Amino acid sequence: FGDYTVSCILVQPVSIIMKRRTFIKTNFTLTSGLLLFGQQACKSNNNLLQDIGLQLFSLPKMLNNDLRGSLEMISKMGYKKLELYGPYPFSSEKAIKEWEAITPQLGFSGSGFFNYNVSDFRSLLDEYGLKAKSAHIHLHTLNTRMPEVGHAARSLGLECVGIAFIPEEKRKTLDGYKRMADEFNVLGDLAKKEGLKFIYHNHGYGLKEQDDQVPMKLILDNTDPELVFFEMDIFWTTAGGADPIEYLKSYPNRYLCIHLKDMSKLVYFSKDGSNPQQWIELLPYMTNVGNGILDIKQIVYEAKKNGVQHFFVEHDMVENPKIALQASLDFLKNI
């Protein structure tokens, strides 16, 4: 307030002075409220993540029992994107048989489009405002049925297709990893012709030196950066003895997708992380995003800085999806 206002107040009757004081108090309160609102709005707009996705293997039993109810829950939580897991109607017979062999141990059998055709599944996702952006697909299917993969992917609006892991028999030696790098280049080219990007999700093996070479880096260095991309799982990367941030910085624009989860305490594979038994051993140490020891905010910052486009929460077969997945999303919305 300027001098003119002060001089006027000094000669006003008491009632007018009181009104003036009320005005000042009200104006201060209103201004403070607007400032607070502005700060909150800026905070909301400056959050590191806006469209957070979910890998559906986080709640496979729920999806198996009630697909529509599960998708509605996911949507109401605030998730926007999805990553699917197979097999699918277009999957190869080999992929389907391998899945059928393990479903008794898993306790569920639903996958892919959950008995819907691709068109109806897309309509169901649209109904709940969800977009499928990525899909894990069996290696054999990608090698033998890429045109069918491409047709389904275009119907769904997928951008990325890739494998969840390299079959164990194909990665026993460095030569095996080199052959996989060559195979990935071929798959990347096939995917590109279908308007897609091929991604490789590493499950934590191949992150330690073998004969003076790190297999994961061998694959990164021997694949075409225009054709082959990667999906980092920050839990399995850490369990394999590697630093997620170091890989993101060292290989900018190679990682298109990332799985976000947390680790209740720092743990590593009992051996080399090469088989499902070693993965299962570490599941008890998986926790909600933000509830563990991983530097989630810094990882997300470096991921965005270095080209990651899709961020998927994944909490493998978590016991209480409604609580766990909501907690992870709430944390990520506020970093």
What is each model feature region?
Residues 1-22:
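N-terminal secretory signal peptides
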Residues 10, 16, 38-73:
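C-terminal segment of N-terminal export signals and the immediately downstream linker at the start
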Residues 22-42:
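N-terminal export signals
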Residues 27-29, 33, 128-229, 322:
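Active-site acidic/histidine proton-transfer and metal-coordination neighborhood
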Residues 47, 71-76, 91-101, 113-132, ...:
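Acidic (Asp/Glu)-rich catalytic clusters
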Residues 50-55, 82-84, 132-137, 161-163, ...:
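Hydrophobic faces of well-ordered beta-strands that scaffold small-molecule active sites
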Residues 59-66, 86-94, 109-116, 138-146, ...:
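Acidic-and-aromatic substrate-binding clefts and catalytic sites of carbohydrate-active enzymes
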Residues 191-289, 293:
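Acidic/histidine-rich catalytic cores of soluble enzymes
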